[in-house]
Amino acid sequence: MSKINKLEHIRNIGICAHIDAGKTTTTERILYYTGKSHKIGEVHEGGATMDWMEQEQERGITITSAATTCRWQDKIINIIDTPGHVDFTIEVERSLRVLDGAVAVFDGVAGVEPQSETVWRQADKYNVPRMCFVNKMDRMGADFYRCVEMLKDRLGAKPLVIQLPVGIEENFKGIIDLIKMKAVIWKDEALGAEYFEEDIPADMKDKAEEYRAKLLDMVVELDDHVMEKYLSGEEVTAEEIKRLIRKGTISAAFYPVLCGSAFKNKGVQPLLDAVVDFLPSPIDIGIVKGMEVSTGEEKDFPISVTEPFAALRFKIMNDPFVGSLTFIRIYSGKITSGTTVINTVKNKREKIGRMLLMHANNREDVKEASAGDIVALAGLKDTTTGDTLSDIDQQVILERMEFPEPVIELAVEPKSTADQEKMGLALSRLAAEDPSFRVSTDYETGQTVIKGMGELHLEIIIDRMRREFKVEANIGAPQVAYRETITKVCEIDYTHKKQSGGAGQFARVKIIFEPLKEVKDLKDEDKNKNFVFESKIIGGAVPKEYIPGVEKGLNNIRETGVIAGYPMIDFKATLVDGAFHDVDSSVLAFEIAAKAAFREGMPKGNPKLLEPIMQVEVITPDEYMGDIIGDLNSRRGQIQSMDPRGNAQVVTANVPLAEMFGYVNTLRSLSQGRAQFSMIFSHYDQVPSQVADIIKAKK
């Protein structure tokens, strides 16, 4: 492997698209024709090589991006197969971060679908050069030219058509190569392994000439010398055209468009040629952004085998035979098994044990890997997704990946006490694999709450918990984390006295409670706190050793508010006076007095119920704006801004979390799946009185 494993010979690519556009089938054919797979796996038979989790084979969708390595010509192609369902966009995001190029697969019948728009935007975010493969050209209703128009209209992309289809629907036979100006026809009986070149059919000559002229007009703009040659009527060679297509693809000046039918085994070999010819090698990318740990400086690090080792972990998977597998993309240097490296994000050392090259769920042990490689490491302990592994002597932190906040949550509880411990272990393992899946405990209800990117996402998590960890669980409805606060200043003087023979209990406290936003002299370090305690005792009215008891009592009791039992936040308590007894006073007595003072004093502060407000961002095509804004208003939302972004609109609104349950499904139906949204916690705000009455009644 090392002989040809030079950086310019590597292509790290992703194959991504909308669900059902045919990504996994396309990948299967690539593996078949590059000699990695001896039998073609069909998704609809549940036998695809890349779809190796049970749930994927049952549902016929790809959930985890399986990584695989294959060869074409003298190049090594590392392929990440990505899911197309909207609930799994995190997998796509993780893949795009470590890729150098991508193939976007489109359904020749449906064209640019909603998830295609999402994936395209994600690829824009990471500046991933890409090309387009219009698949399913054999299907009824397939229309290549309509697809090309949709690339312009819906994605705002600049397509560069380099192939045209020969025949349509069931008569689809092959393609016209606009670079060579030849037709390429496949033999059905040879499962697509045999194909031949012939002259362009007479009825397609004019169309081919028209699109060849468009192609040349676009590529010659990238080179003055070739443009002069072209304008003076000289022939532009195929080599010159290929060089300029490569240049334009890498700089995102345009996106080459190819066509075929992966299912019918037509068009896959020219697609592989295009991957090798036009998509970048790690050398073309050249640098990776990061931070030097010793200086804290942000800088660009060269992608090179001779530089110190640096790699980004982009995925973790539990393998039934090897255990936990960490997928890394090596950006610089090389690594051998047995080496010790450092996780610079967590400042922990990791020893490299087994190193594996993955082919879907088959694996091959390797002793060494270097810049440009994507490998799986077995047995890492402290590394999570987005962490950097680095050379110990020259430490760097590569640009971290950003993951969206979960948008849906459910309560889960084990069906039996025997399942309790197993469930905790299962959930923590699944959360380590997937940064968009979170687990927390609701302290008010004691429930375990799981959070994810959509209902299908959580459904599959629960399914995996059952299958892989043998844990049965009951699924409940989630609850909103309400809070309480006071809205005016109040003062309470309370004496706790207990005498029942022997040592008694005595403590007197005088406390002022005030809303934090009304405190004028608030210290900087207290500005982000939910609760502030201060003692202004002068002259020993309450001895110093008893004051921590007052703070502890208030801290404990504020977890149960006075309206509906939700935690009390955003207030300051100031101890201004008190009294003690030489014998009967104690820390405990002052703790009890503080709790009672809270219970008696807080109702005088005009307490109010608070609810979490989320900042919601919806990205939608223009035509759905009215419906989406109307729906957000009906959810007690307040529209903050509306801005154009490319050929879409971005609506930002503040909406109570309680009104956002089920929103993912509403948005899908309002926009036919074309809009997407994300939400993050913004702040707590008062609940309107009529809503507060309903919440109190439920408690």
Swiss-Prot record:
One of its GO terms (cellular component) is cytoplasm. It is found in: Cytoplasm. GO terms for molecular function: GTP binding; GTPase activity; translation elongation factor activity. Keywords: Cytoplasm, Elongation factor, GTP-binding, Nucleotide-binding, Protein biosynthesis. GO terms for biological process: ribosome disassembly. GTP binds at residues 17-24, 81-85, 135-138. Residues 8-283 form the tr-type G domain. The keyword Cytoplasm applies. The keyword GTP-binding applies. Belongs to the TRAFAC class translation factor GTPase superfamily. Classic translation factor GTPase family. EF-G/EF-2 subfamily. Catalyzes the GTP-dependent ribosomal translocation step during translation elongation. During this step, the ribosome changes from the pre-translocational (PRE) to the post-translocational (POST) state as the newly formed A-site-bound peptidyl-tRNA and P-site-bound deacylated tRNA move to the P and E sites, respectively. Catalyzes the coordinated movement of the two tRNA molecules, the mRNA and conformational changes in the ribosome. This is Elongation factor G.
